[in-house]
Amino acid sequence: MAKPAKKSGPKKAKRNVPNGVAHIQSTFNNTIVSITDTTGEVISWSSAGASGFKGARKGTPFAAQTAAEAAARRALEQGMRQIEVLVRGPGSGRETAIRALQVAGLEITLIRDVTPLPHNGCRRSKRRRV
């Protein structure tokens, strides 16, 4: 029996969003870039893994740059011009991702580090000995 033709869902409507917020989460293993509007609704996102990198290569600065470029490209299609950048995490892709957003054509108005720091909360895990 033939399968019925697959109906594609509604396409995401193109919205004109002139300014927003870029959230960069940079860990040692991956970098995730989410670009939202000022209310926090996600407009575009990308990660090193979604950009085609696997394993240890996801943690590299080049992977972060590629992910940021992909997210910025989609945000520019939605009409975004200015962004604030919120960076979270200790990873190596922090600066490269910010630079990639700037080179892509987005005007950066603010850069803020929002890495959570404990005020002596939970006990740290034991030190790794290699």
Swiss-Prot record:
Pfam families for the chain: Ribosomal_S11 (PF00411)
One record GO biological process: translation
SUPFAM superfamilies referenced in this protein's UniProt entry, alphabetically: Translational machinery components
Key words of the record: Ribonucleoprotein, Ribosomal protein, RNA-binding, rRNA-binding
GO molecular function list: rRNA binding; structural constituent of ribosome
One GO cellular component term: ribonucleoprotein complex
Residues in the signal sequence: none
Described function: Located on the platform of the 30S subunit, it bridges several disparate RNA helices of the 16S rRNA. Forms part of the Shine-Dalgarno cleft in the 70S ribosome.
Record text on subunit structure and interactions: Part of the 30S ribosomal subunit. Interacts with proteins S7 and S18. Binds to IF-3.
Family that this chain belongs to: Belongs to the universal ribosomal protein uS11 family.
Protein name: Small ribosomal subunit protein uS11
Annotated gene: rpsK
